């Protein structure tokens, strides 16, 4: 017990992948193991950190997965199509699949939470930016 997992189903904190883009104000910690020859996760769980007074991108994003957001710390504004929902620590919301959305942090502290994508999407290939002129 407590030893290393030989199945690749356990992700240790020291081995977690952290994704961010240059000049980005958000970091994604992949909590779900990456797909391998023996296992392809059906859901993707990430921990996100979004800096104060920032958003997760310039354009809304659209993807084929349902996204469940659980905010642990700070505040988030979740804009889905034209409706904004304010989340405070402990709140959750669901973004239905294929709806354009963008997340912003209106607060003075870093927003930290979990996002669950079902079915799993593997960055960056399945994330598509969306603008009113169509998908890009």
Predicted regions and their residues:
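Short, charged recognition helix plus adjacent turn
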Residues: 2-27, 132
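A short glycine-rich, His/Asp/Glu-containing loop-to-beta-strand
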Residues: 17-59, 116, 121
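Short, conserved beta-strand element in jelly-roll/cupin
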Residues: 47-51, 61-78
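Short histidine-centered beta-strand/loop micro-motifs
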Residues: 56-63, 104-106
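Short acidic-glycine-tyrosine-enriched beta hairpin
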Residues: 81-97
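Short, charged beta-turn/beta-strand-edge "cap" motif at the junction between a beta-strand
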Residues: 99-102
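Double-stranded beta-helix
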Residues: 106, 111-136
